[in-house]
Structures are given as C-alpha cells and as structure tokens.
Amino acid sequence: MKAVHFGAGNIGRGFIGQILSDNNVEVTFSDVNSAIVDALNHDHQYDVILADEARTTSTIKGVDAINSAQDPEKLHQALLEADIITTAVGVNLLPIIAKSLAPALKEKETPVNVVACENAIMATDTLKEAVLDITGPLPDHIHFANSAVDRIVPQQTHENILDVLVEPFFEWVVEADAWYGPQLEHIKYVDDLRPYIERKLMTVNTGHAYIAYAGQYYGHQTVLDAISDGKVESGLREVLNETSQYIIDEFGFSEQEQADYVEKIIGRFKNPNLSDDLTRVGRGTLRKIGPKDRIIKPLNYLYEHDLAHEGLTHEAAFLLKYQDDKDTETVEKNKYIQEHGIEAFLKEYAQIDSKLAAEIESVYNQL
C-alpha cells in the first residue's frame, strides 16, 4: 500500500507517518519546507524517540517527500497512486490542501481512504466539504473517514532535523464504516467517533490550553514547570472536573471511566521526560476561544444547564490575558480587545451571550 501524508512536521513524522510505516505502508510526505523535504529524500529514514527514561528509539525507513509548492505534478501523480491520504497540517490549512487534493480525487480511478488527523471535531468532514466545493460529487470509491488523534509532540530541535521526540502514549481512532479495505494495526476503529473526539478535545486539549494560559499568568515558561505549580494543577483539576460533567452527560461514559481517563491525561502532562514551551501550546487563541472549541463548547453547555463552570470561566479569562507577540492570533486578540473591549471580543469570537461574557470579564478584571 502507498500513502501520501500532507504535513511533514513533528506530528506527521512522529505519529501518523510512524503508524503507517509500521503497517508496511510506503509513505510519501508532502510539505513546503524545503529543508525537511530535501532531508527526507536524501536519507529516506528518520528516528522516532520515545520520551521515556530509556529514550526508546525506532527507525522509520523507506520514506520520501514531495515539495508541493515546487512539484505539484509529482504530488498529483502520487495522489493518483495512493491507497491512503492523510493530513496533519492544522485544520485552518485544510482548504488549501483541498486545492491540491481535489483534482487528483476527481481523476482517481482506484479506492482511497482520506483521513484528516487534526485537533478538531470531524476534521475530515471539513476537508471533504472543501474538496467537494471544487469537484462536485465524487465517486463512491473515494472514502472520507473522520478520525481522532492524540499524541503529545513538543517543540524540539535535534542534530538531525528529521528525528522527532514523542510521548509513549498515542491514540488514533477512525470511523469504521467509512474506512475502505483492511484495517490497520495500531488504529482503533469504532462505530461512533464523536465521543472519542470530544472526550479527547475536552480533556487533553482543554487541559493543555489551561496549563498554557494559567501557567504563563503564574510566571512559568514550560508545561512541566506549570503543572508542578500547585495553583495550576488545582485549577486544571477543576477545569477537567467540569469538562468531565459535559462528557459524561453527552456521551454516557461512566464517572469512574472518565475519572480514570482524566488521571491518565494529567499523568501525561507530568511526564518528566517530556516538556513543551507554553507558547507552542497556547498559540492560536482566536481558534481556541471559538464557540465549538475546547473552552467555550463545554462552558456554554454547563452555563446553559446551570452547572458549575468557574474553572472554565477562569480558563477563558486566562486566555484573554495571554501574551505572545509572535502569534498572529494573539496579537489580533489583543488589538481587538484594546479597541472594542472584552465583552465585544467574546461576542464576536466566542459567540456567547452577554451574561456569560460578563462572568468571564469579571474574572478577567480580578486577575
């Protein structure tokens, strides 16, 4: 089998590419980073290093890459030959990926699975809609399968730019009925994906974001330093207790099952062999304060059902306080707040009502 994976970054190489390669799939990465593309085509291999005490290392072999900006015809041909097409580029870039993908899928005569591996709810649907806007209806042998992905891959540098450090834990869940052909090892196939996507997003991503925003507020620079601060861990647990209420109510996980999941996630955040800059975790504040994202979606549910939501209210306020002049979304956030105020910002970007916006603003003013 052959796969084309859009995004040769750390997630692409250290998670999706590794799993595909472990299934004896020939992986071709597509990226615009010339240094990464050239290195992949020179070495045809790289190391994935686990963030455990032994630094367990595996070598991913037989890979190559295409510079999608410089060689679109080669990418088009690779897409025509692919059995699997995956992405890990960030959900905001999926419409751009669709422009490369659409002509090949329109022309393609053989079955293919298309899977967007992004930190977003039903990201493959987002990609599919962008493709169909270009192509119109596609034949039945083009299979779009939603997925949920979970693996912490920190910002890092290595002597070999291809090598990547990842946490030992990973989870890749895919819609079973949308997938065509043999199921791959190390991927969990389920009938209903949404509980897994939302549980991950509202636990891992909500928690990670809280650590970033509260951590910076309390003067920390890394996830490990922040989670070692009792104030941050206490606030994190309050937030995850609240999102757990949403998850249990919506999807029927038992209280014990969700509590065990939360403890596992907090344990991952505390991994002494793995830390990350808060600026990498915190960036993209406009997306992360969105109405369907990790903070506002559970907060709105709890607010509307008159359930405890003080932790999430604080998380939203910490996000509003967050500073990073290298992140364009945070710069835009700060400019909008300065010109229009907190309530106007929350109405525009979080799309919440005035009363909940006032609650968040009150906490913001007390910080």
Curated annotation (Swiss-Prot):
Name of the molecule in the record: Mannitol-1-phosphate 5-dehydrogenase
Family of the protein in this entry: Belongs to the mannitol dehydrogenase family.
Keywords per UniProt: NAD, Oxidoreductase
Binding residues annotated for NAD(+), in chain numbering: A3, V4, H5, F6, G7, A8, G9, N10, I11, G12, R13, G14
Superkingdom of the source species: Bacteria
Reactions this protein catalyses: D-mannitol 1-phosphate + NAD(+) = beta-D-fructose 6-phosphate + NADH + H(+)
EC number(s) from the headed UniProt entry: 1.1.1.17
Molecular function (Gene Ontology), one example: mannitol-1-phosphate 5-dehydrogenase activity
Pfam families per record: Mannitol_dh (PF01232), Mannitol_dh_C (PF08125)
GO biological process: mannitol catabolic process
Record-linked HAMAP family: Mannitol_dehydrog (MF_00196)
Enzyme class: oxidoreductase
Glycoprotein among keywords: no
Gene Ontology CC: cytosol
Keyword NAD in annotation: yes
InterPro entries in the record: 6-PGluconate_DH-like_C_sf, 6PGD_dom2, Mannitol_1_phos_5_DH, Mannitol_DH, Mannitol_DH_C, Mannitol_DH_CS, Mannitol_DH_N, NAD(P)-bd_dom_sf
